[in-house]
Amino acid sequence: MGMRFLKNEKGFTGLEAAIVLIAFVTVAAVFSYVLLGAGFFATQKGQETVHTGVKQATSSMELVGSIVAKGSTTNDNITEVTFTLQLAAGGQPIDLNKTVITVLVPKDGDFVELSYESNSSSLDKASEYYVNWIYSLQGSSPDNYLEEFEKAEVTVYLDSTGAGLDINPNDDFIIEVKPPIGATYPIELKAPPSIDSMMVLLK
């Protein structure tokens, strides 16, 4: 018996098959491009997050030289502490105007936060720390940034003429330097057994 084609029946031609195949390939290509783009974006964001995390976890500064303290032999306490800071290797410039120094005395549970001041004539010893620029890239007109090769000599005033802290012989105390970016730099100190007018403190 011969085959008969019913009226209105249509065959699936080679041209139609090619069009469908091209459509599938185009959609697959676009989908792959979107996925690859999302993958590259996620990778970039991941790298930025890791880089930011490393910067936040790493201290940008370090101590240079000795930590020197002045004391009152009358009141038997430390009156001020001076130390010098510089950038750590590979550290980013630090805006000292946004850097806070906290002094803690665990024995008494006392602490005070101090802000930056480089003008001795307007210094408020109770709420500010003083910075004397030993070396600045700007010469005699330093800005507020601690940059590579620069050295900033920091003085904090501790007794009743300053922050109002009473640090006596053998007392432990901590000076924390908190930059706007990077980890806090803690300096753990101990007052000597005997208070002198001038002392070198050990970490």
From Swiss-Prot:
The keyword Manganese does not apply. Residues 1-11 form a propeptide. One of its GO terms (cellular component) is archaeal-type flagellum. Pfam families: Arch_flagellin (PF01917). One of its GO terms (molecular function) is structural molecule activity. This is Probable flagellin 1. Its main location: other. The lineage of its organism: Archaea, Methanobacteriati, Methanobacteriota, Archaeoglobi, Archaeoglobales. Belongs to the archaeal flagellin family. NCBIfam families: arch_flag_Nterm. It comes from the Archaea. PANTHER family: FLAGELLIN B1 (PTHR35903:SF1). Keywords: Archaeal flagellum. It is found in: Archaeal flagellum. Flagellin is the subunit protein which polymerizes to form the filaments of archaeal flagella. GO terms for biological process: archaeal or bacterial-type flagellum-dependent cell motility.
